[in-house]
Amino acid sequence: MEPRGEKSGEADGVRVTPQLLKARSGEFALESILLLKLRGLGLVGLGCLGDCLGLEWLDLSGNALTQLGPLASLRQLAVLNVADNRLTGLEPLAACENLQCLNAAGNLLAGPAQLQCLAGLRGLERLRLRDPLARLSNPLCASPCYWASVRELLPGLKVLDGERVSGRGSDFYQLCRDLDSSLSPDPGAPGPRPMEAQPWVEPGYWEALPPRSSSILEEACRQFQDTLQECHDLDRQAWDSLAQAMRALSPAGATAASFVF
């Protein structure tokens, strides 16, 4: 899915001001801001954002931005999220020499030429141009050679669209891509039609079974009641025997009051 359609026009949009930046960050000076989250504010311009010279982490996703000019002065910026905007180019990011992670999914980047500006960023290791879970993409992602062209343009990437392309674990992702390619049907290739899916179990397998007879439980209860009655009888007999023994051992003329228990 491409980025959202018509957003509010620039006349109705929000622009970045010093007051907005200080309120969102809690800092008193723009140079002191290290982390800034401006997601989903309807921003149409970045205003004085370029004055935040110490900024290292920035989230501008879900706005209506068409250009990133002020970001060219952010030399300390390491993590940038500009997903779900209206960007057709990323040229100002060429000056962000410390950029390591970039999310630009859900914009209007038409081809690899729009990524050429990132080729000089030696520290860029993570790039996202499409996000299937969020249904965000770019026009260039529809090209059959998208993956290969990005890899060729940015050989230093370790993770592309959430998949590791180099380093530990990259072989696994490559194997998954190869399997997907081999299993993808070719419309022009002849071959047998796939078999119709069949149920795994017989009809009625999941239906509730009729209740079983409770004769075993009833017999167990009856035996328990009989045993309990025998215990009561034995208890009564024991008390009778004890009373007889006490009477036999008591001296002549002694009364019940003479026994202390």
From Swiss-Prot:
Which positions fall inside the LRRCT domain?
Answer: 138-183
Q: Which GO terms describe its biological process?
A: outer dynein arm assembly
Keywords from the named record: Leucine-rich repeat, Repeat
What are the record's GO terms for cellular component?
Answer: cytoplasm
What the entry lists under InterPro entries is as follows: Leu-rich_rpt, LRR_dom_sf
Question: Please, which domain of life does this record's source organism belong to?
Answer: Eukaryota
Residue windows of the LRR repeats? 54-75, 76-97, 98-119
PROSITE patterns (UniProt xref): LRR
Q: Does the keyword Repeat apply?
A: yes
Q: List the disulfide bonds.
A: none
This chain belongs to the protein called Leucine-rich repeat-containing protein 61
**Record gene name:** LRRC61
